[in-house]
Design a protein with these regions (language model features):
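Acidic (Asp/Glu-rich) sequence patches and key acidic residues
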Residues: 1-150
Length: 150
């Protein structure tokens, strides 16, 4: 079931609402993020373990020096889900931003109820909020109300 959240809305996970992510004072736990993704490997894949991630690791010497540090520091920074074999890419990307202490999302497809439920479960595990544009909280009730409007 597709949920009506406009594609220009940014879904993120943070420990507090925000207008500007630079103003967030309560940061997410990177260790708990890694723990959660490792527990849920049936759905998520670390970018490092994807074909692209393995290629980058195996060819790190061919990458310009100025870009190597960013690649090496991004270990466990992105989790991927729902590989589209026809298109050749993952359609759901979660990015942990250590500097901001938040997780942002990228969807290459319509957001469905199952996506919101996965994100809400992750947010709850991290003792955090699932947010639209940093302001609107998505909880179980929000999802149910969206479903009723369909």
């Amino acid at each position: 079931m597709n949920i009506k959240i406009k594609s220009n809305k940014n879904l993120a996970i943070a420990r507090e609402k925000y207008n500007n992510p630079l103003s967030i004072s309560k940061k997410l736990s990177f260790e708990k993020w890694v723990e959660y993704i490792n527990i849920h490997q049936e759905y998520f894949t670390w970018e490092d373990d994807s074909a692209d991630g393995i290629y980058r690791k195996n060819n790190i010497d061919k990458i310009p020096e100025w870009a190597r540090e960013g690649i090496l520091n991004s270990q466990k920074g992105k989790a991927l889900a729902e590989f589209n074999k026809k298109k050749g890419w993952y359609e759901v990307v979660l990015s942990f931003h250590k500097d901001l202490g938040i997780i942002t999302t990228t969807f290459q497809k319509k957001i469905e109820k199952k996506h919101l439920l996965h994100l809400l479960e992750l947010a709850n595990y991290l003792d955090a909020l699932l947010l639209i544009d940093g302001k609107t909280v998505i909880d179980q009730q929000f999802i149910e109300e969206l479903e009723e409007k369909q």
